[in-house]
Amino acid sequence: MEKRGDVILGVEDESGQPVSALSILSLLERVSTIIDGVQASQQRMEERQQQLEGSVSAVQSELLKLARDHGATATTVDKLLQKARRVSTHVKEVRSRVEKQNVRVKKVETTQDELLTRNKFRVVIYQGEKEVPSVAVTKTPKGAGLAELEVEPDEYDIPADLSSDEEYMVVEDAESSRGARLKQSGLKGIENIKAAFSKENMNKTREKTRENLSKTKESLSKTGQTLGTKFNTLGEKIVPPEQREKIKQSSERLKENIAKKAPTKESFKIKLKKERTVAEGQEGAEAEPAVTPPKGRKSSPDVTYTEVVTENKREGPVSEEGATRIHED
């Protein structure tokens, strides 16, 4: 074995050129850096996967909250429907009452017409279903209050003088105008109540509530579908299954390439040849006989570098007669 600089004689690569120790060290360093990079990338991928798991758990909790909110909204919708049914029953009762009031108003109108034809004006007040006794209308001064009103029984006396007929007609006209105003205001109020509690308005409100409920249900279903699709797309975008398989395959390929690029025993085979016996005038040919192994050992066809070194260490220096020289190509 001889060393010339950094070149190790006897160690050759596949092309037959000697291999230097520095190149071997550089290759080993590159391999170590590649392995470190792979380990670092694997650690980063693990951290990303942990972050993704945390985000997925947070999304699941939010979905559970949404489901609870959906259940709460369903209960509130049921309550609203029950209230709408109750309101519809109340509306029916109100309609029946309004119809009864209309009948009573018509009766009052007929009685008023009869009284006007007879030149006798009598105020009839209804309180609920009971009829209040009739009261005569009397004039009061403007400054007087309600406490100073005087209620008198019905007395219809024929006026003594002809001049009193004119005053009676003036009072009758004023009272008739007030009655007409009261009648108009009452009719307007009844019409407003009828319009508010009509079948069309109630049907419209019911339809609107149903449409709103259907829209809310559709929006909730759409949000659930969009969330599911988004989560699936996020998982596939971040770490798709194909990419995971590729990562595994790349790690396996790196290991195989490292194992292939590592120096093998065949590259470190030492070609042992005998020393040339050069005679004057003769051309000696290179011979490659088998190396005679030391005593106590059998001969082997291929002797590796490590075996030769160990043999030299055990046996000591080689004598000049049985010395072997490494053939230089």
Swiss-Prot record:
Biased composition regions of type Low complexity, renumbered to the chain: 279-290
Q: Which InterPro entries would you find in this protein's record?
A: Cavin_fam
Q: Which GO terms describe its cellular component?
A: caveola; cytoplasm; plasma membrane; sarcomere
Q: Which residues carry this modification: Phosphothreonine?
A: T292
GO terms for biological process, alphabetical: muscle organ development; regulation of gene expression; T-tubule organization
- Biased composition regions of type Polar residues, renumbered to the chain: 221-232
Q: Where is this region: Disordered?
A: 198-260, 274-329
Q: Which residues form a coiled coil?
A: 198-262
Q: Where in the cell is it found?
A: Cytoplasm, Myofibril, Sarcomere; Cytoplasm; Membrane, Caveola
**Keyword annotations for this protein?**
Activator, Coiled coil, Cytoplasm, Developmental protein, Differentiation, Membrane, Myogenesis, Phosphoprotein, Transcription, Transcription regulation
Q: List where Basic and acidic residues composition bias occurs.
A: 201-220, 242-260, 310-329
Main localization is cytoplasm
Similarity remark: Belongs to the CAVIN family.
Q: What does this protein do?
A: Induces rhoa activation and activates nppa transcription and myofibrillar organization through the rho/rock signaling pathway.
Name it.
Caveolae-associated protein 4a
